[in-house]
């Protein structure tokens, strides 16, 4: 932007962005850069920026949403919808960690013990935590769909080389009995196809070993599928964590299903609005 006598702001000033009356972004100025030509470049972040704060925290018997609510109260952050994550974390020590990492650890524990994924984001000045099933863009019969007409180019990769496991083994050293408990879940069909790809870890006191190996196998016993889309027609509802329908012919395979948005970059230029998306998941048919 160009400097003038109307704009008066500094670090910490609130920034609101709307497009055609639609709320897009609410945050605060963190950095400004000025050139000799009086051009000003401004960097603003939403409330998620404050989750970079570091601390040491001990908590007991809280779900991830309860822990997030506690942190938000301690740091003066506004919250919106915080859906019940269900899984109770018996005891945890977070030492010299960012609030981001603490929350991610709580959500990871929920995911690996239940198979349920939750998404944290800032919705125009309010921290929301929602189940993945609540993150579809649009509504039934009118979901946002990306196809060959709405994106310029794509790059697709499928793999069993990263975060794919067809056998899960967890152990727990039971001090009361003096025995090591071993829990295993596996998919013999995929072991025959890919060989043994084993995930191993130890259990903490209070964790349900059988439930956790079953949840982990369900989570990891599949190919990873990643898709990058460039210059997609912009939609302000799309953010990291959204679920969008993708309908693309990849040559020998056709994709038509929901995919998870891992990262999203919106570009606004005059009357144009584009997105670059990184997606994962989805089922391939045909």
Indicate where each model-derived feature is located.
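Assembly/oligomerization scaffold segments
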Residues: 1-50, 142-157
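Charged- and aromatic-enriched interaction segments used to assemble
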Residues: 36-151
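Short beta-strand and beta-hairpin "edge-sheet" elements
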Residues: 16-44, 245-276
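Short, surface-exposed ligand-recognition loops at beta-strand->loop->(often short) alpha-helix junctions
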Residues: 2-6, 59-62, 233-236
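Acidic, small/polar-enriched beta strand-loop surface segments
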Residues: 7, 104, 116-221, 225-270, ...
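A generic structural signal for short beta-strands and their flanking turns/coil linkers
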Residues: 11-13, 225-227, 275
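A generic structural motif
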Residues: 1, 38-45, 126-128, 228-231, ...
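Glycine- and charge-enriched low-complexity intrinsically disordered segments
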Residues: 60, 276-286
């Amino acid at each position: 932007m160009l400097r003038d006598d109307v704009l008066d702001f500094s670090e910490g000033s609130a920034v609101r962005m709307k497009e055609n009356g639609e709320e897009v972004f609410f945050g605060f100025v963190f950095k400004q850069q000025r050139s000799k030509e009086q051009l000003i470049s401004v960097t603003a972040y939403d409330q998620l920026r404050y989750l970079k704060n570091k601390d040491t925290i001990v908590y007991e018997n809280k779900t991830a949403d309860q822990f997030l609510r506690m942190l938000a109260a301690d740091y003066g952050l506004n919250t919106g919808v915080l859906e019940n994550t269900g899984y109770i974390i018996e005891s945890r020590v977070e030492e010299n960690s960012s609030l981001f990492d603490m929350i991610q650890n709580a959500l990871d524990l929920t995911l690996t013990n239940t198979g349920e994924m939750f998404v944290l984001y800032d919705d125009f000045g309010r921290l929301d935590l929602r189940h993945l099933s609540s993150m579809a863009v649009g509504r039934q019969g009118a979901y946002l769909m990306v196809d060959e007409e709405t994106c310029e180019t794509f790059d697709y990769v499928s793999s069993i080389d990263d975060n794919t496991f067809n056998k899960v083994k967890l152990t727990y050293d039971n001090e009361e009995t003096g025995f090591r408990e071993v829990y295993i879940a596996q998919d013999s069909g995929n072991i025959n196809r890919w060989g043994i790809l084993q995930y191993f870890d130890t259990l903490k006191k209070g964790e349900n070993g059988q439930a956790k190996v079953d949840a982990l196998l369900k989570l990891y016993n599949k190919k990873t599928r990643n898709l990058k889309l460039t210059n997609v027609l912009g939609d302000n509802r799309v953010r990291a964590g959204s679920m969008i329908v993708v309908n693309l012919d990849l040559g020998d395979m056709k994709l038509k299903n929901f995919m998870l948005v891992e990262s999203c970059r919106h570009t606004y230029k005059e009357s144009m609005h584009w997105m670059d998306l990184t997606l994962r998941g989805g089922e391939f048919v045909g």
